[in-house]
């Protein structure tokens, strides 16, 4: 009979009381392979990987989605082959993990390099192998990556890890006081009041049809005067005042949104993104990344963080006319460790997250 839901489906207790794994008793496996013995149910790994990839694609059905396996969970060449064949990318954060993934025959374009203390050798290997992303984790890292890329005569694809001030997981609830995390670059400047970002909870969604109508009206040839007026307003990229409201009456929500964008524009993340953009000859800015915790049971904290990431994306568009093509919303989706715990319902919670991301982008007038 099955042991409990937290065990792989192919694990059972037989009539004699022995644990069986795919029909083999624990005793026979120990006799053959010795102890300690680690068993990986590859059928379970592949099924879960495919489920996550499919759930993400279905939830974010108007966008291209990539799901990554965290190498720190467990990494071997066979596991790398299994998860990449199931459609996943692989996150690495040490030279050893990088070499294991490459030795498995996976091309660099399916690999990501993370880490807050990368060596020059790790950065060089990621650039040489054409990694999908090198995730920038600290303010001085773009210049290091740029220098190595110039030496190699190559262009590196980079993404900035942002500390958005949201933390969740385990027994902790959402907190907005985690700008001192050791990973990533803060969204807001030290001492800034994170309450300025609360305006995101007041944004009103607009229907895609209304958004399209507004865009059509702005760019329609028969509305030349309107086009000129709106273009001047929408192309106002002043760094200090990224959201110009001086020429028309605006709502309190719009004023609060302008204040939030100004706070982000003055923050460390935008400053580092500007450094990356200043090195576009050797650095391709592909997006921004956040990670808010581990063992998170529902989408609420992810939604909170995602809204801030969407506003960062809007702010960079306003200050530098650059739309981040990719936003990585991080991992930490819960799995049950004991019989009394629940795993996150991936299908339900990813749909909630996707709906929040899409509605926020529509409210901000940004593409998906």
List each language-model region with its residue ranges.
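A charged N-terminal "starter" segment
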Residues: 1-157, 172, 178, 194-215, ...
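Structured alpha-helical segments in the cores of large, soluble enzyme domains
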Residues: 48, 101, 114, 120, ...
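Short beta-strand segments
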Residues: 70, 157-163, 289-291, 328-330
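Active-site-proximal loop/turn and secondary-structure-junction residues that shape catalytic pockets
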Residues: 73-75, 96, 117-119, 138-140, ...
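Alpha-helix N-cap and loop-to-helix initiation/capping positions
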Residues: 118, 137-140, 178-187, 252, ...
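Acidic, His- and aromatic-enriched active-site or binding-groove loops in soluble protein domains
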Residues: 159-161, 179-193, 353
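Gly/Ser/Thr-enriched, mixed-charge loops and adjacent short helices
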Residues: 278-298
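C-terminal active-site-proximal or functional interface alpha/beta core segments in diverse enzymes
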Residues: 292-368
């Amino acid at each position: 009979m099955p042991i409990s839901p937290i065990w792989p489906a192919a694990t059972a207790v037989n009539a004699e009381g022995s644990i069986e794994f795919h029909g083999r008793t624990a005793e026979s496996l120990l006799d053959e392979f010795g102890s300690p013995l680690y068993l990986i149910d590859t059928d379970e790994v592949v099924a879960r990987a495919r489920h996550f990839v499919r759930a993400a694609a279905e939830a974010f059905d108007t966008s291209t989605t990539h799901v990554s396996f965290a190498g720190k969970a467990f990494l071997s060449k066979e596991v790398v082959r299994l998860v990449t064949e199931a459609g996943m990318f692989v996150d690495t954060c040490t030279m050893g993990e990088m070499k294991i993934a490459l030795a498995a025959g996976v091309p660099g374009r399916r690999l990501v390099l993370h880490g807050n203390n990368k060596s020059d050798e790790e950065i060089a290997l990621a650039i040489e192998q054409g990694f999908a992303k090198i995730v920038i984790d600290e303010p001085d890292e773009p210049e290091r990556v740029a220098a190595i890329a110039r030496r190699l005569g190559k262009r590196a694809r980079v993404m900035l890890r942002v500390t958005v001030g949201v933390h969740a997981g385990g027994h902790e609830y959402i907190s907005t006081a985690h700008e001192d995390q050791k990973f990533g670059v803060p969204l807001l400047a030290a001492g800034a009041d994170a309450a300025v970002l609360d305006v995101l909870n007041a944004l009103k969604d607009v229907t895609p049809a209304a958004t399209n109508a507004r865009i059509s009206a702005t760019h329609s040839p028969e509305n030349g005067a309107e086009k000129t007026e709106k273009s001047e307003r929408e192309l106002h990229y002043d760094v200090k005042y990224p959201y110009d409201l001086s020429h028309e009456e605006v709502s309190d929500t719009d004023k609060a949104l302008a204040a939030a964008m100004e706070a982000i524009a003055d923050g460390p993340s935008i400053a580092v993104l500007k450094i990356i953009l200043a090195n576009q000859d050797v650095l391709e800015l592909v997006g921004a990344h956040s990670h808010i915790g581990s063992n998170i049971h529902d989408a609420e904290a992810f939604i909170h963080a995602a809204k801030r990431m969407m506003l960062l994306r809007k702010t960079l568009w306003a200050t530098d006319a650059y739309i981040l093509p990719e936003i990585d919303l991080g991992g930490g989706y819960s799995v049950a460790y004991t019989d009394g715990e629940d795993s996150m319902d991936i299908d339900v919670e990813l749909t909630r997250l996707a709906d929040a991301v899409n509605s926020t982008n529509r409210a901000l007038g940004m593409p998906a």
